[in-house]
Amino acid sequence: GRYVLSMQTDFQHRSPTGDDVIKIGMVDLEDGCKWIELGKSEAWGWQQGCQLQFIPGTDSKVLWNDKEGDNFVCRIMDIKTREMRTIPRAVYALSPDGKWAVTTDYRRVNDTRPGYGYAGIPDPNRDVLAPEDSGIWRINLETGESELIISLAQIAAIPNPLDDYSEAKHWFNHLLYNTDGSRFEFLHRWRFPDSLRNAQYEDVGG
């Protein structure tokens, strides 16, 4: 393609805060690698940026996550017309047909695994080990509607054959669709309040 999506920041060597803004843009490979600014984001991290990407099946529509008030949202822009709309939930992974996304709770990820979530909005379930209203959502990218399809409470209720993790704090991360969009995978992670107990899981299987 002609354009390479990219982000621009004015600092390094520290973690972003909820007030740090990153510039969203693209590099024009057919015009001397000219930088073209498209917008900004207040929902980003060094590990995964703001999930900036082209929507599959189109060469003109891109999306990225941002913060709006007390919510993490997703901006969808047509880079040819600059028309932009917002859907009320940040995305994580897109289906190959570009019609759907799955996502997790970036507030909780930031609390449990700083660097992978987004700073700036605290997790309302910080003290809840496996909340019923947090988990993985499926998002219709055309309408913006979303549905919680599996909660942390549901996943934590599945018995662990190796250990009783009823006292552990649970979260989801690293979502990814398969190649035909019929399924997706995710990591279910948990942490015990006892650091020595957590260490038992750090090198499972070598």
Language-model segment annotations:
Residues D163-G206:
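Loop-centered beta-sheet repeat module
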Residues G1, T58-D59, G98, F172, ...:
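Conserved loop/turn motif of beta-propeller repeat scaffolds
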Residues G32-E37, T81-M84, G144-L148:
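Predominantly a core beta-strand signature of beta-propeller blades
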Residues A43-G135, L148-Y165:
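Asp-box/WD-like beta-propeller blade repeats and closely related beta-sheet repeat scaffolds
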Residues M7-V21, T104-D133, L187-G205:
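Short, conserved, GDST-rich strand-edge loop motifs in beta-rich repeat architectures
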Residues G1-V4, V62, A101, F184:
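Hydrophobic beta-strand positions that form the internal "hydrophobic ladder"
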Residues V21-D31, R75-I79, P131-T143, Q200-G206:
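Beta-propeller blade signature
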